[in-house]
Amino acid sequence: MVECPSLIQPLLTGKANEGKSMFRSVKNHSIEYLESPLLSKCDFLTHAFCTRLGGVSENEYASLNISFKEGDEEGKVLHNWNRIAMAFAIPLEQFLVVNQVHGDDVLVIPPYGDFFSTRAELNHDAIVTNRTNLAVCIKTADCVPVFFVDRIKKIIAVVHAGWRSSALEISAKVIRLLREKYGSAKQDILAAIGPAIGRCCFEVDGTTADAFFNQKNNEEFLFSCFGTNKWILDLAGANRRQILNCDIPEENIDVADLCTSCRQDLFFSHRGSGGITGRQVNFMMIKGDAPCRVLTIGDEYPRIQ
């Protein structure tokens, strides 16, 4: 098995491991989160890969759990969302979370107008938009959060890349959409891969490994445990390779290189916890004047549930 590097000092001091881009640790009010140095250069952008720190949830959900669906108390989850909204000065109704169904469907949100009327219409694992003042969110607890930004056209995309979505090459699909629909140039697309389960902790069976065998350069992220039907899968590495295979320059890619399973002091981990845990939020938003608000659904907390 591959050992996870000790990252507590680089995380706290901002010093990078040799040859790696280290995300910055930021504390805003009680909320602790990470920023990509690459994306931080885009002055039109707000982004955060949140940790589990700074909320009010308890026990397995301590403390900044943002999921209403994992068994936590609804009041505490809503309190956590309100803390995030206050820390970033973003009204709660401007956050949007999709349902995340472990597929490769992409929700494209136009700059103006309505885009959903029921939660069932939000069964997607990626969002692409050029709408301002809409914080598009991905929930994670081991899966890979991938952010894309067209730094010239001011278009953003957030991707939930678990192993199934990664096997479907969802990151590559989003890049193709940016280039074909919006005319994004490959040199203008930036990518940031957030904290996720590392290859140090992600042993999979042959059935899961089979889903990646046809991917180009899979020797970089899929490793056989010789003499067994077990494999080591580097999910962040698989998505990085998809991005490179789309001809995005290597210098346009940031990787957090933090394992959520090893660092359960900082992150929720489904595998590391045995399955009972919360979810951290990862989000991006294009700054600017908010478009005319359109009421789309009658549920009390429709955008974040």
Language model features with spans:
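Active-site microenvironment for binding and transforming phosphate-containing groups
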Residues: C4-Q305
